Curated annotation (Swiss-Prot):
UniProt keyword annotations, A-Z: ATP-binding, Helicase, Hydrolase, Nonsense-mediated mRNA decay, Nucleotide-binding, Nucleus, Ribosome biogenesis, RNA-binding, rRNA processing
Biological role stated in the UniProt entry: ATP-dependent RNA helicase involved nonsense-mediated mRNA decay and ribosome biogenesis through rRNA processing.
This protein's name: DEAD-box ATP-dependent RNA helicase 30
Organism: Oryza sativa subsp. japonica (Rice)
Stored InterPro entries: DEAD/DEAH_box_helicase_dom, Helicase_ATP-bd, Helicase_C-like, P-loop_NTPase, RNA-helicase_DEAD-box_CS, RNA_helicase_DEAD_Q_motif
Length: 666
C-alpha cells in the first residue's frame, strides 16, 4: 500500500460524520485503512492522507450507519470479480480510538512500509470506551516549579532574590543569607547540592496510549541460518548473548530490513558490513525489547541504537505543539553528545527527522528554541536536560525510546541522581537501551532497576580488555623524565599524523601544551575549563590536521571519534584502569592498527599487577621493569576501579594562544 500527501487541508471532522476502518481479510496482516465519511456528500476522504489503495480494494465502501458489517469489495472501474474482501467497522467521531487515528498519519511506519508482515500492536479496532489506554494524548505544558523564596540556586551569586531562608531562585540566586558556596557554608546563594533536593513534578502514567515498537522483519536468509551457523558466526566475532528468544544476527545491511532512507544513508557512508555489535544489536533493538550492549569504544555502538531509533520515530504519531522528543539519548560528556548529534543529523536527514543537542557550557537560547520548535530526537547531558525540564522548556511525556550511552562513565561522573530523576519522567513501558564499555557492579545494579526482561549482548569480554589491534608500550620512568621523553617521542613519530596526549590534571595539560608550542610543536589543549567555543575550535583543528597534536584530560577519553589517530601518549597514568582502556581506545578504531605509549612512574605501582594482566591478555610484550614492579607491589593490591569525582570550575588558561616558536618541520 502506498500513501501520498494531500495538497488541500483535511476536512474538519464533525460529530455526525462517520469514521471507518477497513481491514483486508485476504491479507489480515496488512495495515488498516482509516477513512472519513462526510454525511452530507457520502464521500470517503482521509483526514490527513490520501490513500492510493490496492486495485482490488474499493475506492468507495457502502457504510451502514450503525454496526459493523462485512461487505464485499467491487473493483472500482471494471466488472472483474474482486480477489479481496473488506470488513468495515464504523464508529462515530467521539468514539474513535485515538490509537487507530494514528494510521491516518502518512508518516506511520506501516503506512510507508506495506511490505511488513505481522499484526499491529492492537489486533482489532475498538471504541475508545472499550480500551483502557485510549485517553487521547494531549500533553499540557510542564507545570512550573514554584519553590519557596530562596529555595534553590544553581550556582551561588547574583540573581533574583529570595527570602531570608535561602539564596533565591534562578541561575545566580542572591537574596538573603542562605546556604551559598559549593557544598553549603557561608555566603550568598544556594549550594549546588540543592539540585539533588529539587524534585520535578511527578507525571501521571495512568492513561497511556499504546505505541508500536516491534519493527523487526526477519530476512529469509537470516531465517534460513541453522543454530550451528548462528553459533559459528557469533564465535568468530566474539559475540555473547543472553536473554529469552534472542534474534539471530544479521550478516549484511540488507538483512536488517531497514527502510529505504536508512539504506541510502548507509550506502552513502561507505560501510562494507555491520560491525559485530551492529549485527546482533540491530535485531534486538528493532524487536522493541529492552537491551544491554557491552562493547569496546569504536565498535559502532552509536549506529547500533541510532538507526533503530530513526525507525522508531517514523512509526509514532507526529509531534504536536508542546510535545517533547520521542527519542532521548543521554551521554556523559559534551563531546560525545555533539558527536552523536552529528551522526543523528546525518542519518536523520534522509527521513527528515529533527534532532538537537542539549549540553552545558553553551548558550541556552538556541537549545530552548530547538526544543520549543519540536524535535523528535534529543541528545543531552543529564545536568543540562534537568535545567530544561525545570524551566518548562520541554517534557518527556512522548519519550518511548530511551538510550543511556556510556552508562558506566555517567555513574563514574556522579550522574546517578540526575539519571534517576530523568527516567522517572518517562513512561514505564518505554524501550530502554543501556550501553556500556564495562560491566561493574554499579552499572549492573542500575540496569536491573531501569530495564525489563532485556536482551544482553557482549562483544569480547565484559572484563577489562584492551583492543588487540593496539600496540601498547609501557615506559617506566620518573616524573622529571616525562617531558624530555615526550619531546623525543614526538621527534620520532611526528609526520603530520594525529597524536593525542592525555594528562591527569588540567594544570599539567595547559603547562605542557604551552611548553610544546614554545618548542615549536603545533599542539592545542582541551579540558573541562575551556569555553565550549574554544573546545569546538580545538577539535576542529585536530580533526582537520591543522594542529595534529592535541593534549587532553579525560574529558576527551570517551566518545571522541576522530579518524586516523596514529598514536596515543599517556603522559600521566589515569586513576582507573577503565580510563586507561578508553584512552588507548582512541587509536586503532574501526579495525585499524594503532600505538599507545604510557609513562608509568613509581606512584602508579598499585596498578601494575592488573596492567600486566591486560597486556598479557592482549598479547603484548611486558616491560621487565613493569613486571618487577608488579611483583613488588603485590602486597598493595590491585588498582582502584572507581574514578575520581567531577572537576571544579577554573579559569581559562590561554595555553592555546601561546604562539608557536620556530615551528618544527615534519
Amino acid at each position: 500500500m502506498r500513501t501520498s500527501r494531500v495538497a488541500s487541508p483535511p476536512p474538519s471532522p464533525k460529530d455526525h460524520d462517520t469514521w471507518a476502518i477497513a481491514t483486508d481479510l485476504a491479507r489480515p496482516h496488512t495495515l488498516r485503512i482509516l477513512t472519513h465519511q462526510n454525511q452530507t456528500t457520502g464521500l470517503l476522504t482521509p483526514p490527513h492522507a490520501a490513500f492510493l489503495p490496492d486495485p482490488n480494494l474499493p475506492r468507495r465502501l457502502p457504510f451502514p450507519s450503525s454496526s459493523s458489517t462485512p461487505t464485499a469489495a467491487a473493483p472500482p472501474d471494471s466488472g472483474e470479480p474482486s480477489r479481496a474482501r473488506a470488513r468495515t467497522e464504523t464508529y462515530r467521531t467521539g468514539d474513535m480510538n485515538p490509537y487507530d487515528l494514528r494510521y491516518a498519519d502518512p508518516s506511520s511506519y506501516r503506512d510507508r512500509r506495506s511490505d511488513l508482515a505481522g499484526a499491529p500492536v492492537l489486533a482489532a479496532s475498538a471504541p475508545a470506551a472499550a480500551n483502557p489506554y485510549a485517553a487521547a494524548y494531549a500533553p499540557a505544558p510542564a507545570a512550573p516549579v514554584a519553590p519557596a523564596g530562596g529555595d534553590f540556586s544553581r550556582f551561588g551569586g547574583r540573581g533574583r532574590g529570595g527570602g531570608a531562608g535561602g539564596g533565591g531562585w534562578g541561575r545566580g540566586g542572591g537574596g538573603g543569607g542562605g546556604a551559598g558556596g559549593y557544598r553549603g557554608g557561608g555566603g550568598r546563594g544556594g549550594g549546588r547540592d540543592a539540585l539533588d533536593s529539587l524534585s520535578l513534578p511527578k507525571p501521571d502514567f495512568r492513561s497511556l496510549i499504546p505505541f508500536e515498537k516491534n519493527f523487526y522483519v526477519e530476512c529469509p536468509a537470516v531465517q534460513a541460518m541453522s543454530d550451528m551457523d548462528v553459533s559459528q558466526y557469533r564465535r568468530q566475532r566474539d559475540i555473547t548473548v543472553e536473554g529469552h528468544d534472542v534474534p539471530k544476527p544479521v550478516r549484511y545491511f540488507q538483512e536488517a530490513n531497514f527502510p529505504d532512507y536508512c539504506m541510502q544513508a548507509i550506502a552513502k557512508s561507505g560501510f562494507v558490513e555491520p560491525t559485530p555489535i551492529q549485527s546482533q544489536g540491530w535485531p534486538m533493538a528493532l524487536k522493541g525489547r529492552d537491551m544491554i550492549g557491552i562493547a569496546q569504544t569504536g565498535s559502532g555502538k552509536t549506529l547500533s541504537y541510532l538507526l533503530p531509533g530513526l525507525v522508531h520515530v517514523g512509526a509514532q504519531p507526529r509531534l504536536e505543539q508542546g510535545d517533547g522528543p520521542i527519542v532521548l539519548i543521554l551521554a556523559p560528556t559534551r563531546e560525545l553528545a555533539v558527536q552523536i548529534q552529528q551522526e543523528s543529523g546525518k542519518f536523520g536527514s534522509y527521513s527528515r527527522t529533527r534532532s538537537t543537542c542539549i549540553y552545558g557550557g553553551a548558550p541556552k537560547g538556541p537549545q530552548i528554541r530547538d526544543l520549543r520548535r519540536g524535535v523528535e530526537i534529543v541528545i543531552a547531558t543529564p545536568g543540562r536536560l534537568i535545567d530544561m525540564l525545570e524551566g518548562g522548556h520541554t517534557n518527556l511525556r512522548r519519550v518511548t525510546y530511551l538510550v543511556l550511552d556510556e552508562a558506566d562513565r555517567m555513574l563514574d561522573m556522579g550522574f546517578e541522581p540526575q539519571i534517576r530523576k530523568i527516567v522517572a519522567q518517562i513512561r514505564p513501558d518505554r524501550q530502554t537501551l543501556y550501553w556500556s564499555a564495562t560491566w561493574p557492579r554499579e552499572v549492573e545494579s542500575l540496569a536491573r532497576q531501569f530495564l525489563q526482561n532485556p536482551y544482553k549482548v557482549i562483544i569480547g569480554s565484559p572484563d577489562l580488555k584492551a583492543n588487540h589491534s593496539i600496540q601498547q608500550i609501557i615506559e617506566v620512568i620518573s616524573e622529571h623524565e616525562k617531558y624530555p621523553r615526550l619531546s623525543k617521542l614526538l621527534s620520532d613519530l611526528m609526520d603530520g599524523s594525529r597524536i593525542l596526549i592525555f594528562f591527569q590534571t588540567k594544570k599539567d595539560c595547559d603547562k605542557v601544551t604551552r611548553q610544546l608550542r614554545m618548542d615549536g610543536w603545533p599542539a592545542l589543549s582541551i579540558h573541562g575549563d575551556k569555553a565550549q567555543a574554544e573546545r569546538d575550535y580545538v577539535l576542529a583543528e585536530f580533526k582537520s590536521g591543522k594542529s595534529p597534536i592535541m593534549a587532553a584530560t579525560d574529558v576527551a577519553a570517551r566518545g571522541l571519534d576522530v579518524k586516523d589517530i596514529k598514536c596515543v601518549i599517556n603522559f600521566d597514568f589515569p586513576t582507573t584502569l577503565e580510563d586507561y582502556i578508553h584512552r588507548i581506545g582512541r587509536t586503532g578504531r574501526a579495525g585499524a592498527s594503532g600505538t599507545a605509549f604510557t609513562f608509568f612512574t613509581l606512584s602508579n605501582a598499585k596498578f601494575s599487577r592488573n596492567l600486566v594482566k591486560i597486556l598479557r591478555e592482549a598479547g603484548q610484550v611486558v616491560n621487565p621493569a613493569l613486571e618487577s614492579m608488579a611483583k613488588s607491589a603485590s602486597s598493595m593490591g590491585g588498582g582502584n576501579f572507581r574514578s575520581r569525582g567531577r572537576g571544579g570550575f577554573g579559569n581559562r588558561s590561554g595555553s592555546n594562544s601561546i604562539p608557536i616558536r620556530g615551528r618544527r618541520p615534519y
